Curated annotation (Swiss-Prot):
GO terms for biological process: translation. Transmembrane segments: none annotated. Belongs to the universal ribosomal protein uS17 family. Gene3D superfamilies: Nucleic acid-binding proteins (2.40.50.140). CDD domains: Ribosomal_uS17. Pfam families: Ribosomal_S17. This is Small ribosomal subunit protein uS17. One of the primary rRNA binding proteins, it binds specifically to the 5'-end of 16S ribosomal RNA. One of its GO terms (molecular function) is rRNA binding. Part of the 30S ribosomal subunit. InterPro entries: NA-bd_OB-fold, Ribosomal_uS17, Ribosomal_uS17_bact/chlr, Ribosomal_uS17_CS. The gene is rpsQ. Keywords: Ribonucleoprotein, Ribosomal protein, RNA-binding, rRNA-binding. GO terms for cellular component: cytosolic small ribosomal subunit.
């Protein structure tokens, strides 16, 4: 084996799936991600939610769309996620 051989292990990228709740900002969407957690004392399954600002380069996602977001380098002070793909479009009534 060579001592000069550099082996880099690719970090697995964090991805989440959530619903777009706001697209009022330019090139940014707010995604609500909900997860189910078991309560530590009572044992009941409860919903926990978090909002993430994600980068939307072409302003193509609307409120109600279900999207997949991936973590990356910081794009701005509060935005380090980007939209990867559209999972399900919002139903238009």
């Amino acid at each position: 084996m060579s001592e000069t051989q550099n082996t880099q292990v690719a970090k697995r990228q964090r991805t989440l799936v959530g619903k777009v709740v706001s697209n009022k900002m330019d090139k940014t969407v707010v995604v609500l991600v909900e997860r189910r957690v078991k309560h530590p004392i009572f044992g009941k399954i409860i919903m926990r939610s978090a909002k993430y600002k994600a980068h939307d380069e072409s302003n193509q996602y609307n409120e109600g769309d279900t999207v997949e977001i991936a973590e990356g380098r910081p794009i701005s002070r509060s935005k380090a996620w980007r939209v990867v793909r559209l999972v399900e479009a919002a139903r238009v009534i």
